Structures are given as structure tokens and as C-alpha cells.
Amino acid sequence: MCVTKASLPMLSPTGSPQEVEVGKILQGKRHGTISPESCAKLYCYYGVIMVLTVAVIALSVALSATKTEQIPVNKTYAACPQNWIGVENKCFYFSEYPSNWTFAQAFCMAQEAQLARFDNQDELNFLMRYKANFDSWIGLHRESSEHPWKWTDNTEYNNTIPIRGEERFAYLNNNGISSTRIYSLRMWICSKLNSYSLHCQTPFFPS
């Protein structure tokens, strides 16, 4: 005999088909008529219930672990500092008052940045649009009118946009890029990469 307790309650005949079947088996047991087939069915039902219970618990644990281990992948770069504007992988700062080129570069360096550099036409378009009508220093300079233009990290400018004038320090105006003397007063723009990685920056100060 597969069940030894005779005090198991009779299940309602209005229950599910599985409950009715188990009830019949138990009822038959009270009358001493449980067949080997009924006994096997009873064990089968209990086995199915146990398997489903274990599966639900395992699934809950797995989902909980997955949520805990998830790492956001949509934040490739760190946020820009307050009052800076993010564009692609860079942060830009637009000054609120004018200064000469030397002070502007020193200010940017204090923010772990450089006077602004643009690497493509889209970045230049953004700078031109956002500076409004203010002439603004950028990071282009040269030793003399006979030397090539360079950025503050000493990489050469590719001359995609011509620079007007014969002076040594460049700034943006409504006509594009022009040059003037170092002590002229202009607004300025700083730029830096906005990733978590540390990037070495060599300060440039004209002699």
C-alpha cells in the first residue's frame, strides 16, 4: 500500500481534474481498494508538483541574480562637469567674459582641458552655432606666419578651414576662423574628452 495514513481529507469533487483524481484515489484507499495503478498516479502527481515548485524557485533565484549583475552599457562616457556641454565624446565650456589668449589657455588647463579643438565639420558647426555672436579663442596657434598652425597638444592643423590674417593666435568669428595678437580680448572655448580615462595633456604657453 502506497499511503499509510487513513485520515487524509476527502478533496472536493468540484476541484480541478487532478484534485478529483487524487480524491478518488484517497477515497478508494479508505475502502481498501487502492490499485497499483492508482498508487503510481498519486506518486506521479506529487512528483510533478515538486518538480514545478523547484523550477519556480530556481527561476526566481536566477532572475534575481541577473538583475543584480546587470551593468548599464549605455553610458560609455562620464557626464560632463556642470556648465559644460557634451557633444559626442567631448565636453565644451563657453566663457562668460573675455580675456587674452594666455589667460584663456590657463583657465582651460585648470579645468584639465585645453582651448577648444574641433576634429570634424560637425564639431566646428556646433562651436560656431553655440558661441552666438561672440568672437571666441580656440586652441590653434603658430610660431609665425611662416610656420604651420598647431593645436595646443602640438599636433598640426589639417587646414580644412582656412584661417584669415597673419597673426599667431586663432579665434572663431561669424566669418569662420581668424587670427589676432595674443593680448587681444576675446571670449574663449575649452574642450576635453569626457571619458573616465585620464588623458595626459601638455600645457602650451607661448614664449
UniProtKB/Swiss-Prot annotation:
Source organism, top-level taxon: Eukaryota
Topology, Cytoplasmic side: 1-41
GO cellular component, one term: plasma membrane
InterPro entries on file: C-type_lectin-like, C-type_lectin-like/link_sf, C-type_lectin/matrix_domain, CTDL_fold, NKR-like_CTLD
SMART domains: CLECT
Localization, UniProt: Cell membrane
All copies of domain C-type lectin, residue ranges: 87-202
Transmembrane segments annotated in the record for this chain: 42-62
Sequence ranges on the Extracellular membrane side: 63-207
Residues the record lists as Phosphoserine modifications: 7, 12
Keywords noted in UniProt: Cell membrane, Disulfide bond, Glycoprotein, Lectin, Membrane, Phosphoprotein, Receptor, Signal-anchor, Transmembrane, Transmembrane helix
Induction: Constitutively expressed in bone marrow cells. Down-regulated by treatment with 1,25-dihydroxyvitamin D3. Up-regulated in calvarial osteoblast cells by IL-1alpha, IL11, and 1,25-dihydroxyvitamin D3.
GO biological process: cellular defense response; negative regulation of osteoclast differentiation; protection from natural killer cell mediated cytotoxicity
Glycosylation sites: 100
Disulfide bridge positions per record: 80-91
GO molecular function: carbohydrate binding; natural killer cell lectin-like receptor binding; transmembrane signaling receptor activity
Tissue: Detected in fetal heart, brain, lung, chondrocytes, perichondrium and osteoblasts, and in adult splenocytes, thymocytes, lymph-node cells, osteoblasts, growth plate chondrocytes and skeletal muscle overlying the bone (at protein level). Ubiquitous. Detected in thymus, bone marrow, lung, gut, heart, skeletal muscle, ovary, spleen, ileum, liver and kidney.
Membrane topology, from the record: Single-pass type II membrane protein
Modification comment: N-glycosylated.
PANTHER family: C-TYPE LECTIN DOMAIN FAMILY 2 MEMBER D-RELATED, C-TYPE LECTIN DOMAIN-CONTAINING PROTEIN 180
Protein's job: Receptor for KLRB1B that protects target cells against natural killer cell-mediated lysis. Inhibits osteoclast formation. Binds high molecular weight sulfated glycosaminoglycans.
Subunit architecture: Homodimer; disulfide-linked.
Name of the protein described by the UniProt record: C-type lectin domain family 2 member D
